[in-house]
Amino acid sequence: MSETIQLAQKLIQTESVTPNDNGCQTLIADYLKPLGFDIEPMPFGEVENLWARAGKDGPVIVFAGHTDVVPTGPEEKWTHPPFSAHIDADGIMYGRGTADMKSSIACFMVATKQFIKQYPDFKGSIAFLITSDEEGPAVNGTVKVIEALEARNEKFEYCLVGEPSSSNTLGDSIKNGRRGSLSGHLTIKGIQGHIAYPQLAENPIHTLSPALSDMVNKVWDKGNDYFPPTSFQVSNIHSGTGATNVIPGDCVVDFNFRFSTEQTPESLKAGIHQILDSHQLNYDLDWNLSGLPFITPADGELIQAVSKAIEQEMGTTPELSTGGGTSDGRFIAQTGAQVIELGPLNDTIHKIDERVSVSDLEKLTQIYRNTLINLLVT
């Protein structure tokens, strides 16, 4: 069994449901230290973070990843135990974190070892930024490490995030940007009363409905060359006492924007307030911005190096995509670094029987290794 697969199994067999790292980062640090990495644990609150760097000069390429995983769900529904990292007869490894994203960490660790052994005098630096707070609130993880690095003026040019980016075959897609995410928590205030006496009450569901229709039907933008149109989606609506003869006193709505670079948080907020005010609603509205949109240009050195590495190993040309959810790349992109995401297939992430192909992990290791060569040698 190869070193990549052995490392991946060790990480996956370590139960680390967010925000618990449970020793994964110690395993990573122990592997990297003999390769010449300076190891720096960066804990914030209950979250474990690791910054490890080999080299003093630029350019600096950072591999960013997370050791925390989402809960397994009912373990009895799994074909193999979720923390077993079992490999079946078809070469498929099962386990929580196989795709998202402990296997990617193992691949980059081995790729780095192979690269340093082959090119001990490489130009630039290689670093690892690993957190146990990506699947949770993401407030004491990557964002705090970035703040600490910026405070001491430690900069880097490139960042490869090992999130599962592939759709149908390994390396068919590179995420070179992400949409922003803005959430709203809206409370429409009415007047509670008996359902038989509507003239003595004000039903907030009724008063909200026309405004909500305007929000849903509004074309916020048409997108651009890099992003699809901005999306507005309602996730929750809560109202009523549970009784069938009471007009509710309020209605609470949770909604979310996934927005392109055609919008700003301020423009989206203004649009919502304009709609609510035009319907003369009595409301409270709280906002939460969890990420700004970012884009890494297709002609940048990082995308060129990664695309070439995929072509070298897979014989295919990847497409560039900004679809999907947010990742910690949103925090890293604010530094000005070129950021992309490249990892295994994403079709089983967060699901029962999350799994990856062992052969894909061997190929991904070589893609990562070739990326280092393309950036730091050629």
Swiss-Prot record:
Asked whether the keyword Zinc is assigned, the reply is: yes
Active site as annotated: 68, 134 (proton acceptor)
Q: What is its EC number?
A: 3.5.1.18
**Stored Pfam families:** M20_dimer, Peptidase_M20
Q: How is the cofactor bound?
A: Binds 2 Zn(2+) or Co(2+) ions per subunit.
Which superkingdom? Bacteria
The record's GO molecular-function terms, alphabetically, read: acetylornithine deacetylase activity; cobalt ion binding; succinyl-diaminopimelate desuccinylase activity; zinc ion binding
- Keywords from the UniProt entry: Amino-acid biosynthesis, Cobalt, Diaminopimelate biosynthesis, Hydrolase, Lysine biosynthesis, Metal-binding, Zinc
- What catalytic activity is recorded? N-succinyl-(2S,6S)-2,6-diaminopimelate + H2O = (2S,6S)-2,6-diaminopimelate + succinate
Please name the pathway: Amino-acid biosynthesis; L-lysine biosynthesis via DAP pathway; LL-2,6-diaminopimelate from (S)-tetrahydrodipicolinate (succinylase route): step 3/3
Q: Where does Zn(2+) 1 bind?
A: 66, 100, 163
Enzyme superclass (EC): hydrolase
Q: Which GO terms describe its biological process?
A: diaminopimelate biosynthetic process; L-arginine biosynthetic process; lysine biosynthetic process via diaminopimelate
Q: Looking at the keywords, is Zinc present?
A: yes
Q: Which cofactors must be present for this protein to function? A: Zn(2+); Co(2+)
Q: Which CDD domains would you find in this protein's record?
A: M20_DapE_proteobac
Q: Where does Zn(2+) 2 bind?
A: 100, 135, 350
The record's annotation in PANTHER family points to: ACETYLORNITHINE DEACETYLASE, N-ACETYL-L-CITRULLINE DEACETYLASE
Indicate the family of this protein: Belongs to the peptidase M20A family. DapE subfamily.
Function of the molecule: Catalyzes the hydrolysis of N-succinyl-L,L-diaminopimelic acid (SDAP), forming succinate and LL-2,6-diaminopimelate (DAP), an intermediate involved in the bacterial biosynthesis of lysine and meso-diaminopimelic acid, an essential component of bacterial cell walls.
**Complexes and interactors:** Homodimer.
Protein name, per record: Succinyl-diaminopimelate desuccinylase
- Source species of the chain: Hydrogenovibrio crunogenus (strain DSM 25203 / XCL-2)
| Gene designation per UniProt | dapE
